[in-house]
Amino acid sequence: AWLDSFLSTRFDDYLPTISNPATSPEGSSRLSAYLTSGVLSVRQVKHAITTARQSPPEGVDVAVFRKNVDAFASRVSWRCHFVQRLEMETSMNERSINPELDEALGRVDDEQRFLAWAEGRTGWPFFDACMRSLRATGWINFRMRAMMQSVAAYTLWLPWQRSGQHLAKLFI
């Protein structure tokens, strides 16, 4: 039902809305929890995408619709790629690709900075709002997920493993 509603009624503005935290809750597919838990398979999603691309809803700009379909199909493929990488390289979420660089950077596991980051109390309004939204709903769009991890690792200089584990626990 959620996939059908996405492809038939919420899909018109997919590309313009997916990056914006204010519009992405409606404009994104929000299928990640269904895919992760196995309620929905990638095969089902790909089939629905193919069907939608061949038979766009009446009254839509077909070129725009197909551009959105192709972009969504690409995201589903990238999701599969990264799931496969994590399954093949099981230490990827614990060990850096370049351990020498991690050692040279000397990140500090500062508890105060970590808690401020994790609770959305950094003092940066946009970041804090995104973190509080994730904590309340269990979902945030992909650009904001990347921003949250970047703030932890590159701005607050926290170990990326701990912040990554924390984010993973928050996602539905």
Segments the model singles out, each with a brief description of its role:
Residues T50, Q54, H81, E87, ...:
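Hydrophobic alpha-helix feature that most strongly marks membrane-spanning transmembrane helices
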Residues L15-I18, V60, D109-G120, P125-W139:
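Active-site-adjacent structural elements in folded domains
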Residues S29-S32, A71, Q112-L115, P125-R135, ...:
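Contiguous, well-ordered alpha-helical segments that form the cores/surfaces of helical PPI scaffolds
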